[in-house]
Amino acid sequence: FGGGSMLKQEKLDTILEIVNTKGTITVKEIMNRLDISDMTARRYLQELADKDLLVRVHGGAEKLRTGSLLNNERSNVEKQGLQTAEKQEIARFAGHMVEERETIFIGPGTTLEFFARELSIDNIRVVTNSLPVFLILNERKLTDLILIGGNYRSITGAFVGTLTLQDIASLQFSKAFVSCNGIKDQAIATFSEDEGESQKLALENANKKYLLADHSKFDKFDFFTFYNISDIDTIITDSKLSDQTLLSLSKQTKIIKSKP
């Protein structure tokens, strides 16, 4: 990267990307990568540390551990009011992807809760580690509904951890539907490492892998990368995604914009 050609925010994003990918970054590395002075590199690190995006250590910085980020994670209740029209749009379209007699996995997240409401087929088996998704489908009196337990994360309503992973590992799915908090370059990321691990395993055990994400998730990082875009079969997003982003992602996987 040439120093002059990048905006400050891009430089900060680059530092975050490196530290979140590698786990650590040094001042020297930043100076070489971004073509900036020692003083500027240290100032940028301090700015990111002040925003609780990384941890300053001697000579550089480290990636935040999950516990330190908890205050920045939005709860399910907070997320329910965000991009609701877009999430409904995605959910309606994704609902048509499910066929009778399939076994599908639905992960945690408000977009997937909208998706659960749109499922109109009763002759399917649904496996989920999301309590909100389970409750929505249970109201529908879906006959073949499996809730996977484990450690409960009340902030998102998801079950995670060793028990959850053991259960998912023993199952196979026709299709897995997951969501995320950020998509940037090749990376699909979420806030919680535990939630990311369970989604990753479900995707690996599925014949078809679907990512449901509204336009606000694109070109954004989050704490834990759990999957690569090119390994997803189809991304379903809303009509507000820019054509430029659509074109760029189309080179890596199939991406569908739903209609309002």
For each predicted feature, which ranges?
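Conserved phosphate- and dinucleotide-binding cores of soluble alpha/beta proteins
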Residues: L7-E10, T14-E17, V27-E29, D35, ...
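Short glycine/serine/threonine-rich phosphate/pyrophosphate-binding segments
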Residues: T111-F115, F218-F221
